[in-house]
Amino acid sequence: MESGRNLRVVKSDSPVRIHTGKPENLPERLANRALGMKASEIRSLFAVASRPEIVSLAGGMPNLSALPMEMMASVTQKLILENGAEALQYGSGQGHPKLREQICDVMALEGIKAHPDDVVVTTGSQQALDLISRIFIDPNDVVLVEAPSYVGALGTFKQYEAQVVHVAMDQDGLIPSALKDAIATTKSAGRKIKFLYLIPNYQNPAGVLLPADRRTEILDICREEQILVVEDNPYGLLGFDKPSPNAMRASDSENVIYLGTFSKTIAPGLRIGWALVPQSLKEKMVIASESSILCPSNFTQLVISSYLANQPWRDQIASFAKLYKDRRDAALSALDKYFPKSATWTKPGGGFYIWVTLPPEIDTNALVPKAIAAKVAYVPGTAFYADGFGTWSLRISYCHPTPERITEGIKSLAGVIKTEMESRQIN
């Protein structure tokens, strides 16, 4: 062994290992923003919920049984054989020009007239949320969100040290008067609001649809108060009963950033989403994206582009919507049949989720182990609040299991809840 004042080199048959005199405590070096990082409750449940004996009503995994796999295989093979050199090379930081044109065609179904130059392709819409947060949020800035809100957005905002303020919802989504109150209260406290984040169509986690008149009123409020709107729309094309209203971006191209994704309408494993941004913000978005990922995957962009060019994709989306409608119907029927009468729940017209409200004495976090023992998984309501609110609520995801498994899972969950209510003499 050779040694120096602060360094020891241990020689052995294995590769050389270098030791400092004192073991490092690496967690002490973490940045402040990293100290509060933790896995989302959904991710923490994933390992358990993915066990085959568990009926998972937890994660929002799209059901890919309606995806034409043979066609996807053919598209991919043809792409590699005929255009592999481009597909497997680095690409534009803003995204492939052809796909950006096609994305504009997709958004046209939501009433949006967009130019490809204003589209920034991202690694899923989750990366778009990260980019928006990075270029807008300073520590302690306020972000307004729905109550409840998407857990992935809450985690991103927290990572950038934002203060999240929840705005009340009802069965028709965000309440405009509550938004006015939240803005007034926040501004009177001398705090800076950076943007409003919302999911107008079949909201995650509540499943509710924001009506057209509320969209207009919310846009008017935000324009008057000079607050940017971030409109996240993963589920807008997956309506069951009637088309959703036009996107908010369709009415305001200057004060709305629109986020879209192919995760729900094609497949999440391709990891392609996008942001439609006001022209004044595009350069910063592209620079921020290039600094973290260089460019979105050229390969998966071109797979999607070929799919859109060669597949009747509107019909395919309709097939997905029919699949999810059947599962929604099974979930609502099971809730009506098995859940206690004191429980209430939303009745979504599209998307993946149902929001259940139980008597306030019930703690859905405490019930998770009992539900797992009964072979069913769900997400407690507190996951969707930044402040731990919502202990008596939970989210049911009906997108992935079969209708029969959904019925089985909801029946089991109802049994767990009823047993808890009986043991605590809750009506």
Mark where each language-model region is:
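Conserved core of the PLP fold type I
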Residues: 81, 86-226, 230, 236-252, ...
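N-terminal small-domain helix-loop-helix segment of the aminotransferase-like
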Residues: 19-22, 33-124, 131, 309-310, ...
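Conserved glycine-rich beta-strand-loop-beta hairpin in the small C-terminal domain of fold type I
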Residues: 305, 322-332, 343-357
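Conserved core segment of the aminotransferase class I/II
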Residues: 250-252, 257-322
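Short, conserved charged micro-motifs
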Residues: 362-367, 404-408
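Short hydrophobic/aromatic beta-strand micro-patches
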Residues: 276, 355-357, 397-399
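PLP-dependent enzyme catalytic core of the Aspartate aminotransferase-like
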Residues: 2-18, 373-374, 386-427
